């Protein structure tokens, strides 16, 4: 039996619409490379607000889509009940990263300050732009520069000077007026 209390589940994708009549579903991966979602097992599905373990039976490409077959999902009707359900994995299965590399879930919620020690806000999400990732920083309600949100490129050493996950702080070389 899986003890959900001791696990931290991270969303890595989402089940999409059904495919065919034998229980296959399209899948949307939020991993860096779409196929990497299959490297992280076991999967958990968020059903009615609760993470439920599931087993992947098979997967393949169909045109440009990834499709999956889950164990005990053998017909279209059962598959339809899982459409748009989030897929999560236990953070313990993620590999350790090299220094300067971070998982997005570790950065979200961090407070961002610049070199002048100005509190720029809190990371609420991350964006992928192709050339580099971007921190989406929600400013405090009384921001001196009138900003509600800042987009700060996550360029380690160039813009991002330090990340301290223990204190949930990111220090950036970034003008607070931007």
Swiss-Prot record:
Superkingdom of this protein's organism: Bacteria
Entry keyword set: Chaperone, Cytoplasm, Ribosome biogenesis, rRNA processing
Pfam families in the record: PRC_RimM (PF24986), RimM (PF01782)
Location of the protein in the cell: Cytoplasm
Domain PRC barrel: 99-178
Entry annotated with the keyword Calcium: no
A Gene Ontology BP annotation from the UniProt entry: ribosomal small subunit biogenesis
Chief place where the protein resides: cytoplasm
PANTHER family xrefs: RIBOSOME MATURATION FACTOR RIMM (PTHR33692:SF1)
Domain observations: The PRC barrel domain binds ribosomal protein uS19.
HAMAP family per UniProt: Ribosome_mat_RimM (MF_00014)
Self-association state and partner proteins as the record states: Binds ribosomal protein uS19.
Protein name: Ribosome maturation factor RimM
Organism phylogeny: Bacteria, Pseudomonadati, Pseudomonadota, Gammaproteobacteria, Pasteurellales
Gene: rimM
């Amino acid at each position: 039996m899986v003890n959900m209390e001791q696990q931290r589940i991270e969303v890595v994708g989402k089940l999409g619409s059904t495919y065919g009549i034998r229980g296959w579903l399209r899948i949307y991966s939020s991993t860096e490379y779409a196929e990497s979602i299959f490297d992280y097992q076991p999967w958990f599905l968020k059903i009615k607000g609760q993470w439920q373990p599931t087993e992947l039976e098979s997967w393949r490409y169909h045109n440009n889509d990834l499709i999956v077959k889950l164990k005990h999902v053998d017909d279209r009707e059962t598959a339809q009940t899982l459409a748009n359900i989030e897929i999560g994995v236990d953070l313990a299965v993620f590999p350790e990263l090299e220094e300067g590399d971070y998982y997005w879930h570790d950065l979200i919620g961090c407070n961002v300050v610049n070199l002048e020690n100005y509190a720029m806000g809190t990371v609420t999400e991350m964006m992928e732009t192709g050339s580099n990732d971007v921190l989406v920083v929600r400013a405090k309600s009384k921001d001196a520069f009138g900003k509600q949100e800042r987009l700060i490129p996550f360029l380690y050493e160039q813009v991002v000077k330090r990340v301290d996950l223990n204190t949930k702080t990111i220090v950036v070389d970034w003008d607070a007026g931007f």
